[in-house]
Amino acid sequence: MAAAMDWLPWSLLLFSLMCDTGAFYVPGVAPINFHQNDPVEIKAVKLTSSRTQLPYEYYSLPFCQPSKITYKAENLGEVLRGDRIVNTPFQVLMNSEKKCEVLCGQSNKPVTLTVEQSRLVAERISEDYYVHLIADNLPVATRLELYSNRDGDDKKKEKDVQFEHGYRLGFTDVNKIYLHNHLSFILYYHREDLEEDREHTYRVVRFEVIPQSVRLEDLKADEKSSCTLPEGTNSSPQEIDPTKENQLYFTYSVHWEESDIKWASRWDTYLTMSDVQIHWFSIINSVVVVFFLSGILSMIIIRTLRKDIANYNKEDDIEDTMEESGWKLVHGDVFRPPQYPMILSSLLGSGIQLFCMILIVIFVAMLGMLSPSSRGALMTTACFLFMFMGVFGGFSAGRLYRTLKGHRWKKGAFCTATLYPGVVFGICFVLNCFIWGKHSSGAVPFPTMVALLCMWFGISLPLVYLGYYFGFRKQPYDNPVRTNQIPRQIPEQRWYMNRFVGILMAGILPFGAMFIELFFIFSAIWENQFYYLFGFLFLVFIILVVSCSQISIVMVYFQLCAEDYRWWWRNFLVSGGSAFYVLVYAIFYFVNKLDIVEFIPSLLYFGYTALMVLSFWLLTGTIGFYAAYMFVRKIYAAVKID
C-alpha cells in the first residue's frame, strides 16, 4: 500500500501534464473555406449580464433588423442556456474592407428610439449587459489591453493581450448613459495552401470588435449608406436619455487582417486563461496534499486494523478481547437495516446515476468531443446521459433495497425514478416561472419543458424500473455476519462523534481538492466565461473519489470503534460533508465576486446553487457510502465470530 501511494501522485502528475498538451485543441467541427468576397454571416446569440443572470435575445432591444428574421434551429443544450441564435443585417464579405456603413436608416432619417425603447436600452446598459455575436461560429471578443514589452517581441505582446467575451452594450459616466452604436469589426483570416488551378481560400480564425459611441451630429452619412467617422477625440458619445425619444445611427466597419493562427487553434483566444500558472500550481498542490494525507490516513487504518484483527483472532485472548471496547463488539448489529431503507436506497441509486453521468461527460469532454464550438453539446449530452444511466441507478438501488430487507420493489423503483429528479424539476419549474415573468430568453419554452417531461417518463423512468427489477431479483449483498434479534444498547457518544461535527471534519479534504476547479466552474456559470480544462477536471474528479472514499472509511471506523452501529444514514450524510463547504463558498462568491442586488437574480443564484449542492451531496455521499460498505464487509469477514 505504501509503495502504491508513493508512485500514485507522480503518475497523476504525469497524466495532468499529458492532458495539458491538448488542453486547448478543439476538434469535432469541420472548417469552412471562404473565397474572396464570399459572404461571412454575422449572427447574434444573446445578451448577458453577470449582474442580473437573465439572458435576453438580441432583438429584445431595438437593434437594426434584416428584411427577414431567421432563428437557427437549436439543440436542447442551447435552449437551456438561453441562446437564441438569429441572423443580423451586417453585410460582411471575405477579405473585403468597409470603412463605415450605416446599418439601418438613411442619411436624412436616422433611427428614432421611442421613450419606451430608450428606457429599455438605458436599463440594459445600466445593468451592464454584453452583446454576443458569432462569425463562422466564432464568438466575438473585445480586446482589453496590451502590455508593453521592452524587447518589442510581437509574439510575446500577443500573449499579453486579454479578451472579454462579447462587447459592452454601452457605458455610464456621471449619471449619463451612452450606447455603443458603432462597431468596428476586426476579422482575422488564415490563408490556406493554394492547390493547382484553384484560387485562394481563407478561414476565419479570430473575431474581434471595438465598440464605439458616436453622437448623431458627429456622423456624416450619404445616400449610399456610407458614413464618415470623426477623427480622434473630436466626437462626443451617443447619449441615451430614458425620458424622451432619441435619434441615432447604427453603423459598423469591417477590417480584415491575415494571421498565422491555424484553424485548429482559433479557440485559444477564448480558452486561454490569464492566471493559468496559478491554476497549474494550485492543482499540483491539491494532488500532492490530498494523496499525501490520504496515504497517511490509509496507513493508520490498515495498521490499526491489522493489529485489531490479529488480536481478535487469537483464541487464547478471545475473552480478554471481548471485554475490551472495539468495533468487533457490534458485529451482531452492524448490518441491521436502517430506518427508511427505501428512501436511502433511492437516494443512493440517484447518486449512482449522477456518478455515471458525470464520469462519462468529463471523460468524453476531456477527449475533445464536447468542444465549445459545438454549442449546447455538453448540456445536451449530460441530460441524455442522466436519462440513460437510470438503468444503473435502478439496478444498484434495487439490489441494496433487497439487501436491507425491503419487499415493495415497485414503490422503491418509483421512488428512485422520481425523488431526486422530482425535486430538480420542481425547483427549476418555480425558477422558470420567475424567468418567464422577466421575459428572458433563459426561460425554458413550454414545448421544451413538455419534451423534458416526455424524456423523463418515456426514457428515464422505464429504465429505472428495468434496472430496479433486475437488481431486486439479483442475489443481495452477502453480509459476513448474522444480525442479532435484539439490538445492542449504544453507549453515550463523545462530542466529536456528533453528526454535524463529522460533516465538518469529513468535508474539508474533498473540498480542498476541488476548491480551485470550483472557482473556475463558478466563473464559467455566473460570469459567462468559457471552461474547457476538462483534463484538470477529470484529475480533480479522481482525487475527489479517492478522498471521499478514504475519509468515509476513517469516519465509519471510528464510529464502529465507539460501538455505534447506526452507520448507514450517518455515513451517507457525513460523506457528503463537502457539499456544506460548497454552499459556504457559493455564499462567499455571491457576496464578494458578483454584483447582484435584485431579488429575482438572487433567487436564481441561490436556487441553482441549492440544486448544485444537493447534487454534489448525492454524488459524494454515494461514493463514501459504497466505500464504507465495502470496508465494513471486508473487516467483519476477516475476523472469527463465535
UniProtKB/Swiss-Prot annotation:
**Which parts of the chain does the record assign to the membrane side Extracellular?**
24-281, 368-376, 438-449, 523-535, 592-598
Query: What cellular-component terms does GO give this entry?
Result: early endosome; Golgi apparatus; membrane
Cytoplasmic topological intervals: 303-346, 398-416, 471-501, 557-570, 620-642
**What protein name applies here?**
Transmembrane 9 superfamily member 4
What does the entry give for GO biological process?
Answer: cell adhesion; phagocytosis; positive regulation of protein exit from endoplasmic reticulum; positive regulation of protein localization to cell surface; protein localization to membrane; regulation of intracellular pH; response to hypoxia; vacuolar proton-transporting V-type ATPase complex assembly
- List keywords of the entry alphabetically: Endosome, Golgi apparatus, Membrane, Phosphoprotein, Signal, Transmembrane, Transmembrane helix
Record function comment: Associates with proteins harboring glycine-rich transmembrane domains and ensures their efficient localization to the cell surface.
Q: Which family does it belong to?
A: Belongs to the nonaspanin (TM9SF) (TC 9.A.2) family.
| Major localization listed first in the record, in broad terms | membrane
Q: Which species is this UniProt entry from?
A: Bos taurus (Bovine)
Tell me where it resides: Membrane; Golgi apparatus; Early endosome
Q: Which Pfam families match?
A: EMP70
Q: Where are the transmembrane segments?
A: 282-302, 347-367, 377-397, 417-437, 450-470, 502-522, 536-556, 571-591, 599-619
Q: How does the UniProt record describe the way this protein sits in the membrane?
A: Multi-pass membrane protein
Spell out which residues are annotated as carrying Phosphotyrosine. Answer: 312
Gene of this entry = TM9SF4
Q: Which residues form the signal peptide?
A: 1-23
Concerning InterPro entries, the annotation shows: EMP70
